[in-house]
């Protein structure tokens, strides 16, 4: 799916399930094993993987209680707060957000019918998986941060934290676990 018409069709189908519905919460995962964090979208803050959940269900590497609650919100026509990046784009620019682009990827869109009928409590095994074993990295990608990049940590230790106007968590503080 690449055309503007396809994008509009995808957005309309997503909105027919719920105004905040995004397939990425089911079909995509990034797992940061070194820090025990996970997320399904690079725009949201990574959250901890509960070790008690994991002991009961290895699928909790992706299907955390936190994600299941967010999925329920999406299926109940709600807009999860953690997805505000997409809401700001959709509400203030009239543009299509990553909610649509991530959902229309072939590894996501093919599961639309199945996922749209779920309750949010089910385990769903992702089609797109990224695994990070530590924060050792030779790059300082702007969307990453020191928790996931040793080069970011080194730069912040040398020059101090970045001053971001709209970031309100300790995103750019050095990773003290090193």
Provide a role label for each language-model segment:
Residues 89-178:
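Conserved alpha-helical substructure of the radical SAM core
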Residues 3-106, 125:
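Accessory C-terminal segments flanking Radical SAM cores
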């Amino acid at each position: 799916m690449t055309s503007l018409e396809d994008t509009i069709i995808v957005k309309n189908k997503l909105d027919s399930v719920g105004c905040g519905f995004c397939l990425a919460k089911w079909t995509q995962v990034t797992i940061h094993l070194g820090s025990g964090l996970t997320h399904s979208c690079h725009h949201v803050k990574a959250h901890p993987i509960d070790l008690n959940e994991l002991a009961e269900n290895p699928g909790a590497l992706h299907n955390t209680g936190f994600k299941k609650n967010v999925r329920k919100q999406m299926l109940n026509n709600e807009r999860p707060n953690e997805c505000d990046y997409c809401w700001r784009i959709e509400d203030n620019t009239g543009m299509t957000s990553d909610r649509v682009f991530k959902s229309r990827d072939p590894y996501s869109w093919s599961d639309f019918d199945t996922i749209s009928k779920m309750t949010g409590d089910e385990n769903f095994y992702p089609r797109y998986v990224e695994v990070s074993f530590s924060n050792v990295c030779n790059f300082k990608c702007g969307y990453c941060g020191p928790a996931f990049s040793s080069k970011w940590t080194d730069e912040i230790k040398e020059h101090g934290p970045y001053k971001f106007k709209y970031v309100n968590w300790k995103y750019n503080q050095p990773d003290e676990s090193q």
